[in-house]
A protein has these predicted regions:
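Sec/Tat signal peptide C-region and signal peptidase I cleavage site
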Residues: 25-29
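The right-handed parallel beta-helix/beta-solenoid scaffold, focusing on the short coil/turn
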Residues: 30, 36-43, 48-50, 55-60, ...
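Intrinsic disorder/low-complexity segments in short proteins, especially the signal peptide
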Residues: 22-24, 133
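Bacterial Sec-dependent N-terminal signal peptides
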Residues: 1-18, 22
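Surface-exposed intrinsically disordered loops and tails
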Residues: 70-72
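Extracellular interaction modules
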Residues: 10, 287-288
Length: 344
């Protein structure tokens, strides 16, 4: 894994530096060390060169470190930001790798054309273009990352991404399988904005909070999603997924699939809540003009302009259908006190 490689390389670098210090033997020609208090501006890393940064490195271009692929343990080379080290305005391009270790900081990095950043420290204002990737490992924090077309951010368990802007991942259509573009979350993602064509996938162990989704963007929930606002965007809650405090505004959909659950959803005018058979939505607030699409094989409990309503155990009571709303009453099931209004 990227994390294993980072840790392994960190040990190797430390041993090499310690040996050089003790024996007064200079580092290998391919290893460029930026000492604490030193600043290096511009330069290029190629052909398995290493830059080991304890001080400050600005404007570097990195084109080595991933020649054997992102999953190969045989990779060497790249830029290594150590504890206290700082890298600014770096470009990581084809086959390039930037490793930000615990206590290290990278800012204003552009990663493109298959380059990657392995993060156990802090990364600020990273831009991912055209197969550029960022791997946020345990203890790593990425803030202000922008994920453009075919870019990919993976937030591992124990990692944190905050203020991410996602512009890719859903080009194949809503809830399609674009596994390695957009954002995939096993750790925590906070204050994310998902724009047209953007996708956030929250895996079983993942948590997303305070997410804003615009038209053409979507969120796939297999873990937990808290405080999501759908401004025309879509949220899909899969089996074992949980979404709490979702607000559905005009053009937005929340889709709760079999085995998924939603709590405290608010449906505003021209927003839509869809609950599939075997799905569950409780504490729903259906405001005037909001649509509910479900069947008596689902569980939906909440309030609407008539008062309390329920759909559970094959019985529906007090449901309001409008603005595209629909209730399918299955064989041997029942519905009472249903109001079918404009567009229902």
């Amino acid at each position: 894994s990227e994390l294993a490689r980072s840790r392994g390389k960190r040990v190797g670098v430390a041993v090499a530096l310690s040996l050089a210090a003790v024996t007064s033997v200079p580092a290998l020609a391919a290893d460029k060390v930026v000492q604490a208090g030193e600043t290096v501006n511009d330069g290029t890393l190629t052909n398995h060169d290493n830059q080991i940064v304890f001080g400050t490195a600005n404007g570097m271009t990195i084109s080595t470190g991933l020649e054997l692929g992102p999953d190969s343990e045989e990779n060497t080379g790249g830029q290594w930001i150590q504890n206290g080290g700082i890298a600014g305005n770096t470009t990581v391009t084809t086959n390039g790798r930037q490793v930000v270790l615990e206590g290290g900081t990278a800012s204003d990095t552009v990663i493109r054309d298959g380059g990657g950043q392995s993060l156990n420290g802090l990364a600020v204002n990273t831009t991912l273009n055209n197969r550029g990737e960022q791997w946020v490992h345990e203890g790593g924090v990425a803030t202000g990352t922008i994920i453009n077309r075919d870019g990919y951010q993976s937030v591992k368990s124990g990692g944190l991404a905050t203020g991410t802007i996602i512009n890719t991942g859903a080009e194949g259509g809503p809830d399609s399988d674009n596994s390695y573009t957009g954002q995939k979350v096993q750790g925590t993602a906070e204050s994310t904005t998902i724009n047209k064509n953007g996708r956030q996938i929250i895996l079983f162990s993942g948590l997303a909070r305070d997410t804003l989704i615009y038209a053409g963007g979507d969120q796939s929930v297999h873990g937990r999603a808290l405080n999501t606002t759908l401004n025309g965007g879509y949220q899909y809650v899969h089996r074992d997924g949980l979404a709490l405090n979702t607000v559905i505004n005009e053009g937005g959909w929340q889709v709760v699939k079999a085995g998924g659950a939603a709590g405290n959803t608010t449906i505003n005018q021209n927003g839509e809540l869809r609950v599939h058979a075997g799905g569950e939505a409780t504490a729903v607030t259906q405001n005037t003009g909001g649509a509910l699409v479900t069947s008596t094989a689902a569980t939906v409990i909440g309030t609407n302009r008539l008062g309390n309503f329920t759909v559970e155990n094959g019985k529906a009571d007090g449901v309001v259908l409008e603005s595209g709303g629909r209730l399918d009453v299955l064989e041997s099931h029942s519905a009472q006190n249903t109001l079918v209004d404009d567009g229902g």
